[in-house]
Amino acid sequence: MTHPARTARGPDLRLVRAWIDRYWLAVWFGIISAMRLSVLSTGEAGFDARLYLKATRAWLAGADPWILIDTQRFAAPPPTLLPLAPIAILPESIGVAVMIALAVVGAVATVRILRLPWWWILFPPFLDAAWNGNPQNLLLPLILVGAGPLAAFLKIYAVLPMALTLRWRALLVTGAALLVTAPFLPWGSYIAQFGDLSTALATQSDGGLSATALPWLIPVAFAALLFAGRERAAWLAVPALWPTTQWYYSTLAVPALTPLAAAVIAIPVPGAAVVAVVIVAVTRRTTSRDRLVADWRPGILGRP
């Protein structure tokens, strides 16, 4: 008895397609992070931590905190100095290690709080901040767990997502804390040197990555943020519009990103954050005026 010949089957590509659908963004993050590490690893980890802590030690000693390391100048607003003081009194090597560890913890906490896939830890701006020991990675988890005032002292622009997400209590506490601590912080020196410090920031960031690096993108960014809705614009506004942004500023955008927007904002080129906001806005498909108004209408009580 003869059996009919079986038709030869090609490889089943469904599993391959499913794997690509699930992990393409992880691979993209991994490639960019590996490229960034290949550059960063030629130097010493923790540069930002050293700069921040040296500036804080200078302030604690009664000197001007706007110091230089190599060609990089500390130019953050005075409130940044206060939460770093307990770390600055540690031996330098330990202080730098603590700053790097906190940056790693901040990235992990963000992934856990937002319930993102584990591979989001590879998001290149997380890596950039962690390698440099920059406190940027702490902002998002601090805001999300109700410690927004501490985030605002670390980086003053944290007040923008706090305001747009209606965290009134956090804003009131922040304002009160800024008033109470103002006499102890070097605001006079900062204001007197504001022009020079702003120029230093612009030089050190090569003009930044936000729309301010390409001014014709500014109206595009505003329009895209409008159509993205208030909740998403809250997290996207700093990467898209804040002057002289650096790559790790994009960590604030994570709660609002779609996969495609995340892939774009992971690229360290001027205007990428604006393109990401446009993608989020298009995905929202907010075309009616009523829906747009509803997206921006404040809640009654806001958030803590």
Q: Where in the sequence are the language-model features?
A:
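Primarily membrane-embedded glycan-assembly and transfer machineries that use lipid-linked glycans
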Residues: 2-145, 167-304
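Transmembrane helices and adjacent periplasmic/lumenal helix-loop junctions
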Residues: 148-166, 244-249
